[in-house]
Amino acid sequence: MMVSGNDAAVALAEYISGSIENFSNLMNDKALSLGLSSTNFTSPHGLDHDEHYTTAYDLALITDYALSNKTFSKIVNTQSYMVNINGNLKQLNNTNELLGYLEGVYGVKTGFTNGANRCLVTACKRKDLDIICVVLGCDTKKDRTKDSINLINYIFNNYSLIGIKNIIETKVDEWNLNNNNYFTINKGISQNLEIKTNESQIPYEYIAINNSNIEKVAISINVNPYIDAPVSSGCTVGKVEIAIPQSSSFSVDLVSCNSISRKNIYYYMNMFLKDYFSLLTF
């Protein structure tokens, strides 16, 4: 990983799967499990082949997954390493020119073939924003470095991480406070119903957003004010729509926090008796 050892990649593939072809099949199975729709592998080393391809987006997804492996993460964040080869020490230097040079960079990998030209995937973290930058097809190392630095600095200068889950839930809490008598529960023994989000449907807790769009995030709550009893806890009663500029919008179900039973004959009898004895007392 540090010095693009294609021979090591082949040795590992043959040891694990018996052949490059078998190992490539494992790679493609993993790609499918990660949801990579524009990637196909024919080798572990990535040398040019018509059927060996990927995209910048898929490379970012692969990198995000790979960085969850502590050993991989440590290797790609290592600038140099001494190895002992038959008693002779040899220093391996990481080919990632941004490692140790640009603030926050902690990996990941350079690449070059005649068909792909100069490529670089970079992982960089500053404060609470952690990004993966991918540049492909650069003519020179200088272009690769310059483009990566420009992209990384642009993101950190123009984007912030916001707690979208907390924003949604705060909005729903405010709605509950301001709409105490919103619901009419037909034949319900109570009219007091509170709502909350179905948390499992919120796709992410945080999202990076352009600073100019933070105030433009729109959250709308849509619920039916008329509901027939009984109402069970966790019953879907509406939706909250979230529109994020320059990002995919999504919706989350709103569910009831409490249950409300339906009025039955015993309820009416009880009310009748209460009214009757109240009149007698009066």
Segments from the language model and where they lie:
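Acidic/histidine-rich, surface-exposed loop or edge segments in extracytoplasmic proteins
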Residues: N6-V10
